[in-house]
Amino acid sequence: MKVRIRYFASVREALSSSGEAVDTAAGTLAALRDELIARGGAYASALARGKAVRMALDQAMSDEAAALSDDCEVAFFPPVTGG
């Protein structure tokens, strides 16, 4: 399936990319994250397990168990605080 990925803030800076479209067999956010980590290099560092990275699916905050669908939008970003 095709998935649109967007990267924000420090994740965007680490990957030198604001986003990409990928073909994936991943069924969940967790599986997609693992596919990206497996690329190695900046992806492994920016999206590493244990690193504080938040995810959104179709512009709604989601946990790793969220199911992907064809042509969905996934976003990766660091935690954000406000005041």
Feature map (PLM): residue ranges:
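Ubiquitin-like/PB1-type beta-grasp interaction modules and other compact soluble beta-rich domains
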Residues: 1-81
